[in-house]
C-alpha cells in the first residue's frame, strides 16, 4: 500500500515556529516517525512539503493510480484553498486531513476547513501523533476500499 503525505505552507518551519502550538519536533522528525510506523504496517510513503498551493494541487492530481491514500496537512490552505478542495474531489483518491494542533480550539478563522467535505476523515490536535494515527487510518481506509471492491 502506498500513502502520499502532503504538507503545506510553513510546515518546513516546524520546531522553530510557535513550538507551544506545534511542538518542538521538526518536519524531518515527524517524517522519520511516519516512515517507521509505515514500515511496521508494511506500507510505503512519499513525504512532501511545499509552500506553493499550485505544487500541492499538482501532486494531488498526479496521485491518481499511484497512491492508495493521500494524507494532507494543508496548513493555512485548509481554510482558504478551493483549488485544493477541487483537486481532492477530482482525483477520487481517499484523502485524510490532518493537523498538529486542535484547529477548533484556536482562532475562529481556523475553524472552517474547505477540504473537510471532500476528505474521508480528519485527525487533529494530537501533535506528531496525528501523523502516526494517519498512517494507521490510511491502512484502515485501504482495507475498507478493498473489501468494497471485492464485494462487487
Regions found by a protein language model. Name each.
Residues 1-3:
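Extreme N-terminal starter segment of soluble prokaryotic enzymes
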Residues 9-11, 75-78, 101-103:
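Short glycine-rich anion-binding loops that position phosphate/pyrophosphate groups of nucleotides
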Residues 14-28:
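Glycine- and acidic-residue-enriched helix-capping/strand-helix junction motifs
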Residues 44-54:
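Short beta->alpha junction loops
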Residues 46, 96, 105-149:
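Short, glycine-/small-residue-rich phosphate/pyrophosphate-handling segment
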Residues 55-59:
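Short acidic active-site motifs
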Residues 63-70:
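Short acidic/histidine-rich motifs immediately flanking catalytic phosphotransfer sites
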Residues 81-91:
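Short Gly/Thr/Asp-enriched flexible loops that form oxyanion-binding sites at enzyme active sites
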Amino acid at each position: 500500500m502506498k500513502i502520499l503525505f502532503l504538507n503545506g505552507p510553513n510546515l518546513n518551519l516546524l520546531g522553530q515556529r510557535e513550538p507551544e502550538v506545534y511542538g518542538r519536533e521538526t518536519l524531518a522528525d515527524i517524517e522519520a516517525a511516519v516512515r517507521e510506523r509505515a514500515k511496521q504496517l508494511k506500507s510505503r510513503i512519499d513525504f512532501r512539503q511545499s509552500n506553493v498551493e499550485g505544487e500541492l494541487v499538482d501532486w494531488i492530481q498526479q496521485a491518481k493510480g499511484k497512491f492508495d491514500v493521500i494524507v494532507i496537512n494543508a496548513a493555512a490552505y485548509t481554510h482558504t484553498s478551493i483549488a485544493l478542495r477541487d483537486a481532492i474531489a477530482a482525483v477520487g483518491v481517499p484523502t485524510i486531513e490532518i493537523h498538529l494542533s486542535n484547529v477548533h480550539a484556536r482562532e475562529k478563522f481556523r475553524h472552517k476547513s474547505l477540504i473537510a467535505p471532500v476528505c474521508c476523515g480528519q485527525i487533529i490536535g494530537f501533535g506528531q501523533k496525528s501523523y502516526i494515527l494517519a498512517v494507521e487510518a490510511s491502512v484502515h481506509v485501504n482495507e475498507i476500499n478493498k473489501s468494497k471492491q471485492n464485494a462487487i
